UniProtKB/Swiss-Prot annotation:
Entry GO CC: ribonucleoprotein complex; ribosome
Protein name: Large ribosomal subunit protein uL4
Any one GO molecular function term: rRNA binding
Gene encoding the protein: rpl4
Function: One of the primary rRNA binding proteins, this protein initially binds near the 5'-end of the 23S rRNA. It is important during the early stages of 50S assembly. It makes multiple contacts with different domains of the 23S rRNA in the assembled 50S subunit and ribosome. Forms part of the polypeptide exit tunnel.
Top-rank taxon: Archaea
Entry's family note: Belongs to the universal ribosomal protein uL4 family.
SUBUNIT field: Part of the 50S ribosomal subunit.
InterPro entries found in the cross-reference section: Ribosomal_uL4, Ribosomal_uL4_dom_sf, Ribosomal_uL4_euk/arc_CS, Ribosomal_uL4_euk/arch, Ribosomall_uL4-arc
HAMAP family reported in the protein's UniProt record: Ribosomal_uL4_A (MF_01328_A)
Keywords: Ribonucleoprotein, Ribosomal protein, RNA-binding, rRNA-binding
Protein's GO biological process: translation
Organism field: Methanococcus aeolicus (strain ATCC BAA-1280 / DSM 17508 / OCM 812 / Nankai-3)
Length: 252
C-alpha cells in the first residue's frame, strides 16, 4: 500500500510504502477489550479503615424491651450500625477487588493493528466526527522536518497547510464544562479529541504540539489503543511522520 508524503507547506514530497498493518481487519471487539485493559490499569485500588464507625462502646441490650435491638450509647443514641449517624458503611469498597481487566499480548497487538488500520479508513474517520474535507490524504504522512518544530505557532501553521486546522477548531469549540460532581474533582472541562500526532521518538515537536486543543503527541513505540482509539471509538484523525511509519513497520 503506497501513500503520498507531504512537506510542511502542503506540497507533495513523494510516496512511501505502508506495511500490511494498515490493512488489518477491523475488530471493534478486540479494540474495546484492549482499551478497557489500558483504562482499568490506571485505576487506583481504594478501601476504608477497617475500624471506621466501630470505635464506640455502644452495645445492644437485647430483646424483650419493646424497642429495636440496635446498639446504643449510654445516652440511648444508636451507633455502630450502618443506618446510624457515624456508623460503619454497609459493603464498603475493598482494596482486594480486582480492577484491572487483563488482555492477552497477542490480542492487544491485534487490537492496536486493527485501530491503526481504522485510522487509515477515511469513512471511519468521518464517522468519528473529524473534519477531513480539507485533508489531502488519509492516512496523512508528513516529512521528518515536522519533528524539529519548536513553536506551537509553527505547528499550527503546518496544520493549516495540511488542512488539519478545521479539526483543531472543532475541538476548541467543543470544550464544555462537565455536568455533575466531576467538575469538583479536577475534571471541570470536557475536551474533545482532535488530531493525534505520531512521531519517531523524543523531539521538539512533542512540546510544541500538545498545547493545541484536543491534540495528543505520542512516539511510535509508545503508541497504544488508548491514543489512537480513545473511548474505544476507532478512526481517529492521525498525522504520521515518515520515521514514525518506519518504526510502526518494524513493530509489526
Amino acid at each position: 500500500m503506497k501513500v503520498k508524503v507531504y512537506n510542511m507547506d502542503g506540497s507533495e514530497k513523494g510516496e512511501t510504502e505502508l506495511s500490511a498493518v494498515f490493512e488489518t481487519e477491523y475488530r471493534p471487539d478486540l479494540i474495546k477489550r484492549a482499551f478497557l485493559s489500558s483504562f482499568t490499569a490506571r485505576l487506583q485500588p481504594k478501601g476504608v479503615d477497617l475500624m471506621a464507625g466501630k470505635r464506640t462502646s455502644a452495645k445492644s441490650i437485647g430483646k424483650g424491651h419493646g424497642r429495636a435491638r440496635v446498639q446504643r450509647t449510654g445516652q440511648g443514641a444508636g451507633a455502630f450500625v450502618p443506618q446510624a449517624v457515624g456508623g460503619r458503611r454497609c459493603h464498603p469498597p475493598k482494596v482486594e477487588k480486582i480492577l484491572h481487566e487483563r488482555v492477552n499480548k497477542k490480542e492487544r497487538l491485534k487490537a492496536l493493528a486493527s485501530a491503526i488500520a481504522a485510522s487509515a479508513n477515511i469513512e471511519m474517520v468521518k464517522n468519528r466526527g473529524h473534519v477531513v474535507e480539507t485533508v489531502p490524504s488519509v492516512p496523512l504522512i508528513v516529512s521528518d522536518d515536522f519533528e524539529s518544530l519548536k513553536k506551537t505557532k509553527e505547528v499550527l501553521e503546518t496544520f493549516k497547510n495540511l488542512g488539519l486546522d478545521g479539526d483543531v477548531q472543532r475541538a476548541k469549540d467543543g470544550i464544555k464544562i462537565r455536568s455533575g460532581i466531576g467538575k469538583l474533582r479536577g475534571r471541570k472541562y470536557r475536551k474533545p479529541k482532535s488530531v493525534l500526532v505520531v512521531v519517531s521518538g523524543a523531539c521538539d515537536a512533542v512540546k510544541a504540539s500538545k498545547n493545541l486543543p484536543g491534540v495528543d503527541v505520542i512516539s511510535a513505540n509508545d503508541l497504544g489503543v488508548m491514543h489512537i482509539a480513545p473511548g474505544a471509538d476507532s478512526g481517529r484523525l492521525t498525522l504520521w511522520t515518515e520515521s514514525a511509519v518506519e518504526e510502526i513497520n518494524k513493530r509489526f
